[in-house]
């Protein structure tokens, strides 16, 4: 299954790179996700099979941070590839790079990974797959697209329908298990606090992690005008901190501290998030990558410390025959949590921008008047021109596509007063700063929720759990 997933993911990456239309790219990305979902659970399951009980804590502890490091390091690599524009490929290179990586994974799997088979023949739960897939789509699509579509009524109908479908999924899986058939998700897992608590923690934790990454990238690239490479390098201290946190956790802290390490790591993450928010608020438009190091470094350290024991604690509380099912559910919740975080923080971020822009224009009325006076705009025309500037900036930040010029800005583009461009850029940067700070505050609350939910997990990850 791992090899099938790797082959499919690599082929889908090739299709993404060769896409000739947005529709093809979207379809190829969906295929990527499908085969990626085949790979990830196998990794967790094979760890349980390949390592002895005494070694599993460190093995599980390596899995989460490696995934998180990929999420943090990915933007750095992507920014470098886009800026370098190798062979004139532009953004396509971020998909072409998956070809050698995928080939390496496939060869490595055949060479180093043993083949494990169940002692009894298993039948794929096709109906369960369909129900889970439909339920996931009904929840994820409106969460991701709701803001762009201005939250029409049918979006909330889809969300409600998604919950109903997942309810039917649970009933179906329970009945299938009672009939002695193989369920997609073992119902007995939901009776174990380690598993249900892990799902809740993962939802909040990865929602904050992935959502914050998106918001911060938008602020750096769109708000401050950083290039993709510069934006990626700006987050390098976070990646370094994460490696340091992972190394510290792997030195024996996971075995000695268990849940306490996850709690401590989450606290360090919260400190880092607060530090980044304060830095952004104080530095404003003068922000440089150097300013962010004191906040991003502990943010990364906390990520490493928290993620290292996460999978170990959760999976140590399930039986051997439940590992595959639990692994699949955990990785699914990780993706669902990421989508929820993107939807929530994205809605907050973009929802605040238009109002923040108009507020800053109103607060800077004296400065705008000085710009008009210097440009020789007659006093009688200044209120109308100021209103037009206000409308233009409001519509510009509310536009989904930053390359599209709103109709309200077309009348100004040809005869803009001198100094107005600088004024407008300053207002937009201030609005992005305010939206980023508030969104980081929401992410802080999500991390606080993950901290509280972590008390549902076992106190320690016993290496002999399930044996």
Describe the residue ranges of each PLM region.
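Transmembrane-helix exit segments and adjacent C-terminal regions of multi-pass membrane proteins
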Residues: 175, 312, 372-467
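Residue-level signature of the transmembrane alpha-helical cores
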Residues: 2-8, 12, 28, 35, ...
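Transmembrane-helix signature of multi-pass solute transporters
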Residues: 8-19, 31, 35, 101-108, ...
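Helix-loop-helix hairpins in multi-pass membrane proteins, especially solute transporters
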Residues: 1-127
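Small-residue-rich alpha-helical segments with characteristic i,i+4
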Residues: 40, 45, 57-73, 235, ...
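Transmembrane core module of solute transporters
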Residues: 157, 165, 174-322, 444, ...
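Interfacial helix-cap and linker-helix signal at transmembrane-aqueous boundaries
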Residues: 77-87, 143, 220-221, 252-254, ...
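Hydrophobic transmembrane-helix bundles of small-molecule transporters
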Residues: 83-200, 208, 226-227, 234
């Amino acid at each position: 299954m791992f090899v099938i997933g790797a082959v499919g993911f690599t082929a889908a990456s090739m299709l993404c790179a060769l896409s000739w239309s947005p529709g093809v790219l979207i379809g190829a990305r969906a295929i990527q996700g499908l085969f990626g979902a085949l790979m990830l659970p196998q990794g967790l399951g094979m760890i349980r099979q390949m390592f002895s009980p005494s070694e599993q804590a460190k093995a599980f502890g390596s899995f989460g941070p490696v995934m998180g490091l990929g999420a943090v390091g990915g933007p750095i690599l992507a920014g470098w590839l886009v800026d370098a524009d190798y062979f004139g490929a532009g953004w396509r290179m971020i998909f072409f790079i998956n070809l050698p990586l995928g080939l390496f994974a496939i060869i490595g799997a055949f060479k180093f990974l043993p083949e494990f088979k169940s002692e009894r023949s298993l039948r794929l739960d096709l109906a369960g797959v369909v129900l889970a897939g439909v339920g996931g789509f009904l929840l994820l699509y409106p969460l991701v697209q709701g803001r762009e579509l201005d939250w029409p009524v049918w979006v909330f109908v889809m969300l409600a329908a998604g919950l109903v479908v997942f309810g039917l999924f649970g009933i179906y899986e329970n009945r299938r298990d009672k009939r002695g058939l193989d369920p997609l998700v073992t119902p007995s897992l939901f009776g174990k606090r380690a598993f249900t608590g892990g799902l809740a923690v993962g939802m909040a934790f990865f929602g904050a992690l992935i959502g914050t990454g998106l918001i911060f990238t938008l602020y750096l690239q769109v708000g401050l005008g950083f290039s993709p490479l510069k934006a990626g390098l700006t987050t390098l201290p976070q990646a370094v901190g994460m490696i340091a946190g992972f190394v510290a956790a792997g030195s024996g802290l996971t075995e000695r501290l268990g849940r306490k390490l996850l709690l401590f790591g989450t606290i360090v993450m919260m400190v880092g998030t607060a530090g980044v928010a304060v830095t952004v608020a104080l530095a404003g438009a003068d922000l440089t990558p150097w300013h962010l190091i004191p906040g991003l470094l502990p943010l990364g350290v906390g990520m490493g410390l928290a993620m290292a024991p996460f999978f170990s604690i959760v999976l140590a509380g399930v039986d051997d025959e439940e590992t595959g099912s639990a692994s699949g559910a955990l990785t699914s919740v990780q993706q669902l949590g990421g989508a929820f975080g993107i939807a929530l923080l994205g809605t907050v971020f973009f929802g605040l921008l238009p109002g923040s822009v108009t507020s800053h224009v109103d607060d800077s009325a004296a400065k705008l008047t000085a710009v008009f006076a210097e440009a020789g705009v007659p006093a009688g025309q200044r209120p109308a021109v100021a209103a037009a500037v206000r409308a233009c900036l409001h519509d510009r930040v509310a536009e989904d596509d930053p390359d599209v010029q709103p109709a309200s800005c077309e009348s100004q583009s040809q005869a803009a007063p001198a100094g107005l461009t600088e004024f407008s850029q300053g207002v937009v940067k201030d609005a992005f700063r305010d939206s980023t700070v508030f969104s980081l505050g929401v992410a802080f609350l999500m991390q606080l929720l993950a901290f509280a939910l972590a008390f549902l997990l076992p106190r320690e990850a016993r290496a002999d759990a399930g044996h």
